[in-house]
Structures are given as structure tokens and as C-alpha cells.
Amino acid sequence: MIKVLVIADTHGQNQRWIELKNYHNPDVIIHAGDHMTTKQFMDQNATFWVAGNNDSIGNEIEIFQLGQINFVLMHGHQAPRDNLKKWYQLLVLKAQQYPCDVLIFGHSHIEYTNKINMIQLINPGSLQLPRNQTNTPSYCTFIVNKDELTDLTIHYYQASKVS
């Protein structure tokens, strides 16, 4: 069993990220870009991470496997975001260039989970600059059991529940 924490769009403000790391004690931390911090910090605090459109370090795409599940990680700025529904489809097309069961991305600052063309999409939203309807910071957790992703949950950050 692998416990996973997914965050994105922290924009150089890392306090909540570290709080969540300590609170959830995950086996794996995934950051979907716009971290705006140093490589040293990223390497110490994220297992897998990519560069966003505001980052000067990191790869555009990371391909990895947890258990028997194939992941594609990208920020999301690799496709135009004029219309969210169309944007999701374009990101799936990009992810399908690789073995992909799960696509993790950020960029919109809006949390989202859905399955498109047999690919599980996960956008954790933003821990610092949310653009969801309630302007509430968000992140995601899930568990990998061999070939199964379970307990996929979008969480809304509340300092009182993590400190």
C-alpha cells in the first residue's frame, strides 16, 4: 500500500505543503508544477515533480509507475486552456503518447477528478492561489494497492485540521 499526497501551484509558499507532509505522512509526494522554489527543496520534499509555466527548473513531463499503475505528470500549460472541457481532452491526448493510467496536472488552480478515455485525471487545485468557487485551497490524496488506485479524495485545506 502506497499513500500518496498530490499538490500543485504552491507558488513559492511552502508552509502548507510542509504541514500536509507532516500531517498525512505520505509515502510519495507529487507536485504538479508552479512550485517556484529551488531544486534542493523540491528534491527534499517531493518524490515526483515537474516545472510549471512559472518555474525555471524541472522537467515538463514525468512518467513513472507506482505499483502497477502508469502515471503521467505534467503541469497543464502544454495545452491551451480556453475551455476547461476541451483542455482536459487535449491533456488526455498528450498523456496518451505514453503508457498512462493516471494523468496528474495543475495549472488551472481548480480541483478536478474524472475519467476520460479510461485515464483517471487528477488536478489537486492550488494550495496557495485557489480559483475554485469558494476560493478554498485544495490538494489530493489517494492510495495505490498494486494495480488499483483507491481512496481518491480532494481535500480542502484548513489550518486547524493540520496543525
From Swiss-Prot:
Species assigned in the record: Mycoplasma genitalium (strain ATCC 33530 / DSM 19775 / NCTC 10195 / G37) (Mycoplasmoides genitalium)
Xref: SUPFAM superfamilies: Metallo-dependent phosphatases
InterPro entries with a match to the protein in the record: Calcineurin-like_PHP_lpxH, Metallo-depent_PP-like, PdiEstase_YfcE_CS, Phosphodiesterase_MJ0936/Vps29
Family membership noted in the UniProt record: Belongs to the metallophosphoesterase superfamily. YfcE family.
Cofactor: Mn(2+)
Protein name as annotated: Probable metallophosphoesterase MG207
Residues reported in the UniProt entry to bind Mn(2+) 2: 34, 53, 75, 107
Pfam families membership: Metallophos_2
